């Protein structure tokens, strides 16, 4: 178990994944986001939806938008659809994955 440099609760399970920040060699750096898992069908991959609010000055109103992120899901964390997770930026793991799950906080379902 290695220290990733962030104050998060380490997973209880142990995995053999090379791309795990806790048990493998993947280093994390950059932005940290929190969102809800909307899809977990891919192999060690999840899709995260985040709500972003923006101000439109012309109408003096706020708008809600959702953005999606594709992140690597290590077997030791194993987040499922409906979980609230914290992801952090890392080197590109694949063509679309540049984030990795570092903590699973709660389940909304």
Swiss-Prot record:
Gene Ontology biological process terms, A to Z: translation
CC annotations in GO: cytosolic small ribosomal subunit
PROSITE patterns (alphabetical): RIBOSOMAL_S17
GO molecular-function term, one example from the UniProt record: rRNA binding
Entry-linked InterPro entries: NA-bd_OB-fold (IPR012340), Ribosomal_uS17 (IPR000266), Ribosomal_uS17_arc/euk (IPR028333), Ribosomal_uS17_archaeal (IPR019978), Ribosomal_uS17_CS (IPR019979)
Keywords: Ribonucleoprotein, Ribosomal protein, RNA-binding, rRNA-binding
Summary of the function given for this chain in its UniProt record: One of the primary rRNA binding proteins, it binds specifically to the 5'-end of 16S ribosomal RNA.
Similarity field: Belongs to the universal ribosomal protein uS17 family.
HAMAP family according to UniProt: Ribosomal_uS17_A
Assembly notes: Part of the 30S ribosomal subunit.
Protein name as it appears in the record: Small ribosomal subunit protein uS17
Organism in which the protein naturally occurs: Methanococcus vannielii
Name of the encoding gene: rps17
């Amino acid at each position: 178990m290695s220290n990733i440099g962030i104050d998060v609760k380490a997973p209880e399970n142990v995995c053999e994944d090379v791309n795990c920040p806790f048990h493998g060699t993947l280093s994390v750096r950059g932005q940290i986001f929190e969102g809800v898992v909307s899809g977990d069908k891919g192999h060690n991959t999840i899709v995260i939806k985040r709500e972003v609010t923006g101000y439109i000055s012309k109408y003096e109103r706020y708008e809600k938008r959702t953005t999606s992120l594709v992140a690597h899901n290590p077997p030791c964390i194993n987040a499922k659809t409906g979980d609230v997770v914290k992801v952090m930026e890392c080197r590109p793991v694949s063509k679309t994955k540049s984030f990795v799950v570092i903590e699973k906080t709660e389940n909304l379902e």
